[in-house]
Amino acid sequence: ADYLKLAGYNYTEKLYDEHHEKHPDWVIYGSETASTVRSRGIYHLPYDTGLLVYDDLQCSDLGNSVVNWGASPFRSFAMDAAAEYSMGQFVWTGFDYIGEPTPYNTKNSYFGIIDTAGFEKDSFWFYKSVWDIAEEESFIHVSPCCWDFNEGQLIDVLVYSDLPFIRLHYCGEMYDGKVIDHLTEDKLCARFTVPFHKNKPLAVRGYLSPDC
């Protein structure tokens, strides 16, 4: 690395600051990061009790299934963003693929942002919210994308958007508001917890200003 002045780090973003201080002339980047495993459209709750795999042999698309050598998309992105000298990161992986069965025993991995059928997992919308610099229409993506749970069950709702001010409306009224800040780890998405009630509408709105 000292010869090329270029250093890629696999799952060791924690070393960035130390190595940058020792070698300020190095170009540092994340050569392999994240490794969150997800089954598209499968949600296991609560969010804070994430497991690699559940009794149904599926991972959770909330982003709370992480391998022991990896990090959540939020943690991985935040560590990279905090290192202003970092060139960026390569996330493992863009697509699910056959082989390296994780979790075992299945024929394919679940690391992808997009599954083997070409459909976006919820992490796609997170990365779009923080990476997309094109002048496109603003968007909101709500996770879980399905709304079918047990009556009264507390549901963690994650909202990804390029809009900074998010309001959640539930049961016909404004339920709560959050601020998204793409430079702060615990504000990379808007997170709400609501009790599930069948046939009660849930809607999310995003704004550029808190005064809207």
Language-model features: where?
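Extended substrate-binding grooves/exosites of carbohydrate-active enzymes
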Residues: A1-D211
